[in-house]
Design a protein with these regions (language model features):
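Internal catalytic or translocation cores that form aromatic/hydrophobic pockets or channels
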Residues: 16-57
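Conserved alpha/beta-hydrolase catalytic His-Asp/Glu region
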Residues: 41-96
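Conserved hydrolase catalytic core segment
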Residues: 1-24
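Active-site loop signature of alpha/beta-hydrolase-fold enzymes
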Residues: 21, 123, 147-150
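A structural signal for isolated positions on well-ordered beta-strands in alpha/beta enzyme cores
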Residues: 12-14, 114, 140-142
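Conserved serine/cysteine hydrolase catalytic core
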Residues: 74-135, 143
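C-terminal alpha-helix
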Residues: 161-169
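Catalytic histidine-centered segment of alpha/beta-hydrolase-like enzymes
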Residues: 144-159
Length: 171
């Protein structure tokens, strides 16, 4: 959208730990837990699963994980809980893996943007982030310590940084 015919609809763009090139190993890691919906007996079991699988998100408060469980789950007909998303979301990663390299579209983005990267991210590698900052819309870069893919941007220091970035992008 940001590089297409409707690009003028977007006035600022925050990119959270993703880029125009995605490493196969990171895609395989994500596919290992996204393809089949797990089942949980209760919210406590679901929170344990979420905290484990999404540990790369980095440190987050208990309130964050409780909210994530409340907003990420749905009750099945059999009374169990499961994640509330379309498991076919993975089709984009398996059907057209060659399209996960889209530097040409990156070059076309003209919208002011900023890039957040988890310091231990396996999805947005340091070289990819550096290349992004030197090409296309040339975003600013904020690296979030103690996390991989993807930073939650939910703790007070991250929220403060995000607000500052948004203020600067809107100028």
């Amino acid at each position: 959208l940001a590089s297409g015919r409707d690009a003028d609809r977007i006035t600022a763009l925050i990119i959270n730990d993703i880029g125009p090139e995605l490493p196969d190993a990171a895609i395989d890691r994500i596919l290992s837990y996204v393809g089949e919906l797990p089942k949980f007996a209760d919210f406590a079991d679901a929170q344990i699963w979420l905290r484990t699988v999404y540990a790369p998100f980095g440190p987050a408060s208990d309130l964050f994980w409780q909210r994530m469980a409340r907003t990420s789950l749905r009750r099945r007909d059999d009374g169990q809980l499961t994640l509330h998303y379309d498991p076919r979301i993975t089709a984009q990663f398996t059907a057209s893996r060659h399209e996960l390299r889209s530097w040409d579209r990156w070059q076309d983005i003209r919208t002011p943007c900023h890039l957040f990267r988890g310091a231990q991210s396996d999805l947005l590698l340091p070289d990819t982030a550096a290349r992004m900052c030197a090409s296309g819309p040339r975003p600013g870069l904020s690296e979030i310590g103690d996390c991989g893919h993807a930073p939650t941007l939910s703790n007070p220091s991250d929220i403060k940084a995000l607000r500052g970035v948004l203020r600067n992008l809107r100028r």
